């Protein structure tokens, strides 16, 4: 398990304070996946309502608040596969 992914999951848990109402997966290219749901964030690769894929730099910028997820999507740095409504709820929860 990557230390970087574990730290990212911890950062997301602090930022989101208890998860969100839905299930989402961040697929960080070449590194692995982080699941987010009502139980919070964890390093795992499970079924989700939406999968968001980005490189490590983009993902880091999103979780640190330096890059808005919507901006990342519109610029092609973040791809979304699945329920767009869930992706929007997650973006709001991360704000």
Briefly describe each language-model feature range.
Residues 1-95:
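Feature captures hydrophobic
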């Amino acid at each position: 398990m990557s230390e970087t992914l574990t730290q990212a999951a911890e950062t997301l848990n602090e930022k989101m304070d208890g998860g969100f109402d839905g299930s989402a997966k961040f697929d960080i290219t070449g590194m692995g996946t982080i699941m987010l749901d009502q139980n919070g964030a964890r390093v795992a690769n499970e079924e989700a309502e939406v999968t968001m894929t980005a490189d490590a730099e983009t993902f880091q910028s999103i979780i640190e608040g330096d890059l808005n997820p919507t901006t990342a999507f519109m610029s092609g740095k973040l791809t979304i596969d699945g329920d767009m409504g869930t992706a929007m709820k997650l973006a709001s929860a991360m704000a």
